[in-house]
Amino acid sequence: VNNMEIIQGIIEAAKIEQAPLILQVSAGARKYASHIYLMKLVEAAVEDSGLPICLHLDHGEDFEICKACVDGGFTSVMIDGSKHSFEENIELTKRVVDYAHNKGVVVEAELGKLAGVEDAVKVAAADATYTDPDQAVEFVERTGVDSLAIAIGTSHGAYKFKGKPELDFARLEKISNLLPNFPLVLHGASTVIPSFVEECNKYGGQLDGAQGVPEDMLLKAGTFGVCKINIDTDLRLAMTASVRKHL
């Protein structure tokens, strides 16, 4: 989430479905909107909806940003040390986990690298690496992290696949079997809803070839321990389509 309008739209949908929410804030959004404004908007969302709402930092790149969000009232934080070596990622993640757990805040980490661009996270397709199942077990055991974002073929942005959508479900199943009942996370998992793409293009957008993760694949991932699916691109497409249509 970046502003009041996005939060309002999400809340209205959640009220209709009577569904709990995880509202994610990137470091860029936090800088743009200001921490205190975001906190007040989320407090208003809780009061307005009466629903359980979690405020989560997405892709925190260092200990300092995670600490600031923990101290500032976030429910959970993500430390993304995927650009570092395996050992450095463990060291950084454990430092965040130790601090956050002492404050009652849960932590998500990432192992493997997703291609694509999101906020300050930029990874070329050639540099993307899938999560090693055996390393995932060691990583969780040594860090004490609460959930783990894994790489099995999804990517950030609206252009997730050049051809037929494919995810490495064999890899996901192995990770799930090695980490039974452990929460796994898929980033870059928007479906890139065709009607939103068509609406954007109809009113001047240029999203030819945009393609996301089919819903049936997301449902299948849910049977292998994936309990959090990030869909920022779909939210941006919905808002962009509406803004283009009305302006």
Model-predicted regions and their roles:
Residues K202-L207, V213-L247:
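C-terminal alpha-helical cap/extension of soluble enzyme domains
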